[in-house]
Curated annotation (Swiss-Prot):
Gene behind this protein: arsB
Main location: membrane
Alphabetized InterPro entries for the sequence: Arsenical_pump_ArsB
Organism: Escherichia coli
Localization (cell): Cell inner membrane
Keyword match Cell inner membrane: yes
Protein name: Arsenical pump membrane protein
Example of a GO cellular component annotation carried by this entry: plasma membrane
Keywords: Arsenical resistance, Cell inner membrane, Cell membrane, Membrane, Plasmid, Transmembrane, Transmembrane helix
Membrane topology label: Multi-pass membrane protein
Amino acid sequence: MLLAGAIFVLTIVLVIWQPKGLGIGWSATLGAVLALISGVVHIGDIPVVWNIVWNATATFIAVIIISLLLDESGFFEWAALHVSRWGNGRGRLLFTYIVLLGAAVAALFANDGAALILTPIVIAMLLALGFSKGTTLAFVMAAGFIADTASLPLIVSNLVNIVSADFFGLGFTEYASVMVPVDIAAIIATLVMLHLFFRKDIPPTYDLALLKAPAKAIKDLATFRTGWIVLILLLVGFFVLEPLGIPVSAIAAVGAVILFAVANRGHAINTGKVLRGAPWQIVIFSLGMYLVVYGLRNAGLTEYLSGVLNVLADKGLWAATFGTGFLTAFLSSIMNNMPTVLVGALSIDGSTATGVIKEAMIFANVIGCDLGPKITPIGSLATLLWLHVLSQKNMTITWGYYFRTGIVMTLPVLFVTLAALALRLSFTL
């Protein structure tokens, strides 16, 4: 287990620190090659791992391409300007609406899209309103926080969700029926915590006249309009076609192709730039990283965790839910949520849990891996990239500040969200 653990730690360090600009895909590939050479994993493990990650990574890339195309069309800025007008000049209402917009974007376009696309738009809008640096920081932190805490409701809302749903064969409707009400509880808890934490930084009023008209944000009307149609078709497709055996990735890919074709025909959007901006390295990263994680499984780590989960399972639904959720949240915060979700899934699969207890553990693993990364900056790749985007905007958030904020806000929200899950599953007993 020591060798497998050492390879895993080396891989995680390379992925997080990215020395000399080394891409996450190549870092994970190096780890996978070391695992293969050392015998920690075997050639036969490659197709097993690929079967776990292919649908998840393809779906994620398609959703991000859709997000980038809509962003270039002005879709998200248009939405942000509209919700800012709904605030009617009241600071707390504006704060609430920006958070709710972030929740909606996270649900439909994944947490990465919400954090990375909305953040620059929010910063630009707040600068136009003449807000102070402290106020801008409050809004930006809120946008970044809700992107993860509200990425629970749909399979496509987070790469973690897709991996877990694929691993356990959860259908789109089956997943949503459990997690949509849980997500609502998470959003309410997040709103309460954000308002409490940043209460002194939210201005009482703002001047609506300083905002530009939402229509002026639209750069490509055809892509903007098609985006609405694609979104509706995607949601219908996910709920109707996925139960028929059509992969979520295929449905998302069709949506991306339609929107790309419209954008490419209009020439207002640099579609080549959009394709270059898509996270292609996530394919190599997922395969490489999960091969390294599979090495931990082969070395017996997941067997040990399965033993811990067995103890929790014996104590009933609530203990299993809270125990699994807090365990995977902690692991996500120290070793990144992408490897953690597979470690959790393998451990649950190897446990003796059955029925609603196993179901609780599966969803608690997702919650822990979605929310746990907010405790530390290294918890998710999206957070690291988000911090980099902020530094480019002359808004540096130190790791110390992030950790202090993250731990105070995440733990109560995690508690409420896991309680909501246990309550939701109590109705299926």
